[in-house]
């Protein structure tokens, strides 16, 4: 329930002109209250004016938007375009306003990007857009005299692609005086060359970087990864994501005569020097028989591990089942591996070791069939902490799903299930794993009936708290959604370049 203070704040910020004319007469401790009220009601003019006059030393957006005694609603999942742009404009006004000398830290981290915006305008400013607005503001202010006499540290989760690379570089490496100093605890990179990636990381302050995501269209091989880790260094890094094929050997690298992967050994040693690293995602890298080489040197147990589609063999699964990381795992993705069919006892030993900590388990396209359901029920039953279970793309019938759902109801903390379209809904003889065209060609009416049956299973078990869904093409990714046009252009250019290279090769052969 909202407090009388907050109701009064809402009434006040609804009169934009009145607030702006009287900001100098408002007590400092009311600014946070008025800010949340203006953000909630999307009074962008008031939001900007509040930041322009901000009388406190710190402005931390996530702290101001989180639940409090005056207003219990959490607004951190509102990446409202109008309000966030107003915040940045207000910071710029603050810098240029004479007499404004208290603000030292502006923290824009902690905003959660979601699929459906609850703000009145319904328009989101995602991580890439926020990066662009911040970089543009920094560039516009460079060279301006700073009335405060000291730069304002602006903390932000940066998302850098080819589309905003030049602007971000200029913001991070100003040529002259800069009233805003960008601090980057988290960085996501996409559609960059290896050289561009190294450049932006060097400027972003890798010594303070906590999370690094290098994804999709950053074409790295093992030589690049080794260079990245040895030359840049990330002593504070807690989370690392590497792109597809990041552990492939460089094209000019001759295989070791004794079969050792010296580059991987070197990379693993560099990772072992990161004493705070607890999250590692290396999906779609070929790591057959190499998991022990990669993970055994790590000194700190991993909490998050993504090994989806890494072509793991029995040796790899055996190592995972017995290594020191497993008892600490909270999030595990082993999608794309035929685990239950090929290595059932080893895989279920792994689940047993992780049972007391595992919160999120993803087993998409693992060829789990009806004949495996009883084993899956036994394997999952000890996982008392499990909150999310995702198993899209597995050829399971409606009856098998009903049995599995009945067992999942027994997991007390489970809140979210992503289940596949039942195989009953596809034509006879459908081949798994399915391509994007095939996966969408199913009998919607049959699916609706089975999905309703599955929800009825939950209701009969008094588990209305469990949300179920079938996202055909995977869970919503706000970063991909926001930059889809740029990624499409990048892929088309890469395809064109490949065709040109192929054509030249044919001409040389002739």
Curated annotation (Swiss-Prot):
> Could you tell me which SUPFAM superfamilies the record lists for this protein?
RNI-like (SSF52047)
The disulfide bonds in this chain are: none
Q: Which PANTHER family match?
A: LEUCINE-RICH REPEAT-CONTAINING PROTEIN 14B, SIMILAR TO PREFERENTIALLY EXPRESSED ANTIGEN IN MELANOMA-LIKE 3
Q: Where are the LRR repeats?
A: 100-137, 181-205, 234-273, 274-298, 299-330, 331-349, 355-382, 383-407
Q: Which organism is it from?
A: Mus musculus (Mouse)
Query: What InterPro entries does its record include?
Result: LRR_dom_sf, PRAME_domain
* UniProt similarity note: Belongs to the PRAME family. LRRC14 subfamily.
UniProt superkingdom: Eukaryota
What gene is behind this protein?
Answer: Lrrc14b
Keywords, A to Z? Leucine-rich repeat, Repeat
Output this protein's name: Leucine-rich repeat-containing protein 14B
Establish whether keyword Repeat is in the entry.
yes
């Amino acid at each position: 329930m909202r407090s009388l203070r907050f109701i009064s704040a809402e009434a006040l910020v609804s009169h934009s002109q009145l607030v702006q004319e009287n900001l100098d007469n408002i007590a400092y401790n009311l600014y946070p209250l008025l800010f949340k009220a203006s953000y909630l009601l999307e009074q962008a003019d008031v939001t900007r004016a509040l930041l322009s006059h901000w009388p406190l030393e710190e402005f931390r957006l996530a702290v101001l938007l989180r639940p409090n005694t005056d207003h219990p609603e959490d607004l951190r999942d509102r990446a409202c375009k109008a309000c966030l742009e107003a915040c940045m404009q207000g910071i710029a006004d603050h810098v240029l306003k004479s007499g404004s000398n208290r603000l030292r830290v502006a923290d824009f981290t902690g905003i959660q990007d979601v699929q459906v915006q609850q703000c009145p305008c319904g328009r989101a400013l995602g991580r890439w857009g926020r990066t662009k607005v911040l970089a543009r503001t920094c560039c516009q202010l460079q060279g301006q005299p700073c009335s405060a006499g000291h730069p304002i540290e602006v903390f932000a989760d940066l998302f850098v692609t080819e589309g905003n690379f030049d602007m971000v570089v200029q913001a991070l490496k100003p040529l002259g005086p800069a009233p805003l100093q960008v601090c980057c605890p988290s960085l996501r990179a996409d559609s960059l060359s290896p050289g561009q990636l190294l450049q932006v990381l060097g400027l972003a302050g890798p010594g303070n970087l906590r999370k690094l995501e290098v994804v999709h269209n950053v074409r790295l091989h093992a030589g690049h990864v080794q260079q990245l880790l040895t030359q840049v260094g990330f002593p504070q890094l807690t989370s690392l994501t590497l792109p597809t094929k990041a552990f492939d050997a460089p094209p000019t690298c001759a295989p070791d005569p004794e079969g050792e992967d010296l580059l991987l050994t070197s990379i693993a040693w560099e990772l072992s020097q990161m004493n705070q690293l607890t999250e590692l995602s290396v999906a779609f890298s070929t790591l057959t028989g190499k998991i022990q080489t990669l993970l055994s040197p790590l000194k700190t147990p991993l909490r998050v591990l993504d090994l989806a589609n890494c072509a793991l063999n029995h040796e790899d699964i055996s190592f995972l089942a017995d290594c020191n990381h497993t008892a600490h795992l909270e999030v595990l993705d082993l999608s794309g591996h035929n685990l239950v069919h090929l290595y059932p006892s080893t895989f279920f030993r792994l689940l047993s070791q992780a049972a007391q900590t595992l919160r999120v388990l993803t087993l998409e396209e693992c060829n789990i069939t009806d004949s495996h359901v009883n084993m899956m029920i036994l394997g999952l039953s000890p996982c008392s902490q499990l909150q999310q279970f995702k198993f899209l793309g597995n050829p399971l019938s409606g009856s098998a799903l009903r049995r599995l759902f009945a067992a999942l109801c027994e997991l007390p903390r489970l809140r979210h299930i992503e289940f596949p379209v039942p195989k009953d809904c596809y034509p006879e003889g459908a081949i798994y794993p399915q391509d994007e065209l095939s996966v969408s060609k199913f009998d919607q009416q049959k699916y609706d009936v089975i999905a309703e049956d599955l929800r009825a299973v939950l209701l009969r078990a008094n588990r209305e708290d469990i949300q179920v869904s079938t996202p055909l093409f995977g869970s919503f990714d706000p970063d991909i959604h926001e930059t889809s046009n740029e990624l499409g252009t990048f892929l088309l250019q890469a395809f064109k370049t490949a065709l040109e290279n192929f054509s030249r090769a044919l001409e040389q052969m002739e």
